[in-house]
Amino acid sequence: MEIGIDIEQNERFKDVSEHFLKRVYTKNELAYAFKFKNAYEHLCAMWCAKEATVKAFSNLKIPFLEIEISSTADGKPFVVKNDTILSELTKLGLSDIKISLSHSKEYSTAICMIY
C-alpha cells in the first residue's frame, strides 16, 4: 500500500493562465470545474488530487494530463484508470486507487491511497 497527500491555498488557482490549465487539466476536468462559480476551488482540489497521486506512486514522473480526476453520479471522486495508471499499478503489484478531496474557502486538500 502507498499513500500520498497534498494541501494548497485556493487563491493560487484564481488567476492561472490558459496555458497552465491546458497543460494540467483534461477537457473533462475543466468542464466540471467551470460549472461552478468557485471554479478555482475545484481546480485546486483536483491539483491536490493529482499531486497526492504522484506522491503515492513514489514521485514517479506521471504527466498531470495522464492523471484524470472524475466523480461518480453521487459526487464521489476517483482517479480514472487509464493505460498509464493501470501500468503504474501493475509495476507496483497493486490493483486499486482511492482518493478523497476536501476544500474550504482558503484551502484544498487530497489524499490518495493505492493498494
Where are the language model's segments positioned?
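Core catalytic alpha/beta fold that binds nucleotide/phospho-ligands
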Residues: 1-115
